[in-house]
Amino acid sequence: MSYKNKVYVSMDADNDLHYYYLMKAWKQNDNTRFNFYDAHDINTILDKSEESIKRGLEERFRNTKIFVLLVGEHTRYLYKYVRWEIEQALKRGLPCIIVNLNGKRSMDSERCPAIIRDELAIHISFNAKILQYALENWPESYERKLKEGKTGAYYYTEDTYKGLGL
């Protein structure tokens, strides 16, 4: 069994890829604490067939411990890969962090894909501090809530955001 320490980031690559690149820039910035082990660094998928792409994505999932979904304006309409990635995360029981690119700090029912709206997940705004906080704290909370049989959308309180200076 492989050691799972990666963060798998799913997004609308046509419209929201720059947010993923911003996360990578935060990681490189010496002035932030932000850090994550990117599952997308595991392999490069060159073949453009759907079967080959999904095979490469499955390899990334095998080393993943946390699933992050960047939710933009069009995310809920994406079925070919984003929905498949969400299905994989849920099937594998990964803690899910849903990041609202519009700044909303709770579940955005208009943008969040239906497949994950009622699943156990934390919904946050797009910001390095709250995302780092979620990466560090949500997996343990997720496991506890899972054992308690809880489901549904969770979000951090305003006090949590204030404590982070947000």
Task: Set out the residue ranges of the language-model regions.
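Short catalytic/ligand-binding loop motif for oxyanion handling, primarily in non-cytosolic enzymes
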Residues: D16-Y19, R76-L78, K104-S109
